[in-house]
Amino acid sequence: MICVEILPPSGFVKYHRRMLRTITLFLALTTTAFGQNSAKDEAQVWQLEKAYWEYVKANDLEKYRALWHENFVGWPFVSPAPVRKDHITHWITANTSKGIKLQSYSIEQLAIQVTGDIAMDYYRINETWADSAGAEVRTDRIRITHTWIRTHGTWQIIGGMSSPVNATGQ
């Protein structure tokens, strides 16, 4: 039996080495670009969460509603069941109708994950509510998660849930 080893021409080997280098470089650049886009998207979503609370503080229900996707469904802790977009301002008006307004807040960002056109964020918020004279009426500490979807270049909330913090404030 005769064994013959067939060697590819030397140009063929050089071509494959160059191709492997090109593919490796492309993958490295693509990974970096996606990482930068993800960080940019994360920053955008956190900015929108801050805008959300500024709209609540200013009682700007129109801008607040614009943050929500038409197909939103979520479960705020003040509701006995999940709600849709047509009920998202009820908790705000329930306070303002009693003369109570969000006076201040602070957000503790805990986590965010962006995957393509979906982002999920998790945070705790401290809220101080005051009457029309500015006297503090109550403080709330709440856990919140929102699911954002990017449609037509704009992020909107499509899902969410909130609950009071536990006994240790977490």
Predicted regions and their residues:
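Sec-dependent N-terminal signal peptides
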Residues: T22-T32
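A solvent-exposed, acidic/Ser-Thr-rich amphipathic alpha-helical stretch
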Residues: A39-W46, Y55-G116, Y122-R124, E136-D140
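Short beta-strand segments enriched in hydrophobic/aromatic residues
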Residues: W68, I125-E127, M161-P164
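Beta-strand elements of well-folded, non-transmembrane domains
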Residues: E127-D131, W148
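Short beta-strand edge/turn micro-motifs at domain boundaries
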Residues: R141-T168
